[in-house]
């Protein structure tokens, strides 16, 4: 995926140049005659006969990848305790971390007597790649963090679904009509 800025006259839904096919989508006006759009590239070697379904798959896969990336490394959190208290970070929500946070949260409902606080988690890295830790003093803090993460993931999915449903497929359909 590549973000491009240019004049609307430079935008073409599908371009074939050299060894690749460029699929453009998400055209947005920025200001005056300046626009922004996203491009996805398909190697011609792997695409002997381009189809509308291949174009749709490429665009939807690109949107899915951006949603996954946003979930993975963009959950905003302000550290509550410890050396990094007050620092705004982007929490690393890998599948493993999500599972660890969920396990600790669920333990409150299944075996509350086995929960101990304070508990500490590595939640991010700073710009110098040093670990950033959060110290949860009680279940309420852990719950706010965990439920905030769940809400953030849901927001990311909703934005992706909205982006997909907002795509006008007409220019791509027209492209294939002229190719016939």
Language-model-derived ranges and their functions:
Residues 2-180:
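A preference for well-ordered globular domain cores
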